[in-house]
């Protein structure tokens, strides 16, 4: 069998890890073992938090819609139910954007929701 030299692949693998560890302090950015552990942990957190971010934004949108709806004497759940009855199909992101940036348009939606309820 021919002799296999893995220097190129090993160097590529280590360079890839050190590139991901760029900016880390001390040995975590220079030493391959420390960098590898830290990068693995960072990637695990990044994966987990990409999922968490979706939940957090949905929660934020609901809070904003609820606050704006309560200014018009509606709770969040009654507001959303009334919008569904009025056949207004807007997602929470758009409703939250209206609540923050265009209160007049949100007031119209609240009025429609009150009529539908």
Curated annotation (Swiss-Prot):
CDD domains: Ribosomal_L20 (cd07026)
GO MF term set: rRNA binding; structural constituent of ribosome
Keywords associated with the record: Ribonucleoprotein, Ribosomal protein, RNA-binding, rRNA-binding
GO biological process assignments: ribosomal large subunit assembly; translation
Domain of life of the native organism: Bacteria
Gene3D superfamilies: 6.10.160.10, Ribosomal protein L20 (1.10.1900.20)
A cellular component annotation (GO) from this entry: ribosome
HAMAP family for the chain: Ribosomal_bL20 (MF_00382)
Protein's name according to its UniProt entry: Large ribosomal subunit protein bL20
């Amino acid at each position: 069998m021919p002799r296999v030299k893995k220097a190129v692949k090993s160097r590529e693998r280590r360079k890839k890890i050190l590139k991901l560890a760029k900016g880390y302090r001390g040995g975590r950015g220079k030493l391959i073992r420390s960098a590898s552990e830290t990068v693995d942990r960072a990637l695990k957190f990044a994966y987990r938090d990409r999922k968490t971010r979706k939940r957090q934004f949905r929660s934020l949108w609901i809070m904003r819609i609820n606050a704006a709806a309560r200014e018009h004497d509606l709770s969040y759940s009654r507001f959303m139910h009334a919008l569904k009855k009025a056949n207004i199909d807007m997602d929470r992101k758009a409703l939250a954007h209206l609540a923050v940036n265009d209160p007049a348009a949100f007031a119209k939606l609240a009025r429609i929701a009150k009529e539908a309820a």
